Amino acid sequence: MLGSRAVLLLLLLLWPRTAQARAVPGGSSPAWAQCQQLSQKLCTLAWSAHPPMGHVDLPREEGDAETTNDVPHIQCEDGCDPEGLRDNSQPCLQRIHQGLVFYEKLLGSDIFTGEPSLLPNGPVDQLHASLLGLRQLLQPEGHHWETEQIPSPSPSQPWQRLLLRPKILRSLQAFVAVAARVFAHGAATLTP
């Protein structure tokens, strides 16, 4: 009799977690393992597109704080911690999706136009394609994330591009590193 009570208690303890662990509305969850693989590939591509070259302090321009504030960051309130992912992973996945859209627009902008690494199958082109692939994995057919309007980058001057490219790629490296950790945890603990 004690064995059946223990089994019942175990089922009751596990049931709320599986019932609440929903990634997107409608009860579907992302393919955590596929997201993990693509996010790891994104990390590798981000580092190959812009390898580390030591610490460089670039002078801040006026309005630079504004552009820094526009860059998506995964923060505590996004629910990307293990408990937040278990209870409701949608806010976290929506934040990651928002960041992927942001960086996809930047990589497709004139900031990277003419860059040798943008040639077909170059590092930035592969990075752009992988961002698109992960974004599509996170957004199931027929479902549109409610994200803030992400403005397209304004046209840049050639001299600005040389400063913006490494800054964007460093920011992307940090973003995809956190996203990869989220997907690794999801693949390890939330996959049915």
Curated annotation (Swiss-Prot):
A single MF term (Gene Ontology): cytokine activity
Binding partners and assembly: Heterodimer with IL12B; disulfide-linked. The heterodimer is known as interleukin IL-23. Interacts with IL23R; this interaction enables recruitment of IL12RB1.
Native organism: Equus caballus
Transmembrane intervals: none
Keywords, ordered alphabetically: Antiviral defense, Cytokine, Disulfide bond, Immunity, Inflammatory response, Innate immunity, Secreted, Signal, Tissue remodeling
Chief location bin: secreted
Keyword Cytoplasm: no
Pfam family, one: IL23
An annotated GO cellular component: interleukin-23 complex
Biological-process GO terms, alphabetical: defense response to virus; inflammatory response; innate immune response; positive regulation of defense response to virus by host; positive regulation of T cell proliferation; positive regulation of T-helper 1 type immune response; positive regulation of T-helper 17 cell lineage commitment; tissue remodeling
This protein's name: Interleukin-23 subunit alpha
Compartments where located: Secreted
UniProt similarity note: Belongs to the IL-6 superfamily.
Signal sequence, start to end: 1-21
Functional note: Associates with IL12B to form the pro-inflammatory cytokine IL-23 that plays different roles in innate and adaptive immunity. Released by antigen-presenting cells such as dendritic cells or macrophages, binds to a heterodimeric receptor complex composed of IL12RB1 and IL23R to activate JAK2 and TYK2 which then phosphorylate the receptor to form a docking site leading to the phosphorylation of STAT3 and STAT4. This process leads to activation of several pathways including p38 MAPK or NF-kappa-B and promotes the production of pro-inflammatory cytokines such as interleukin-17A/IL17A.
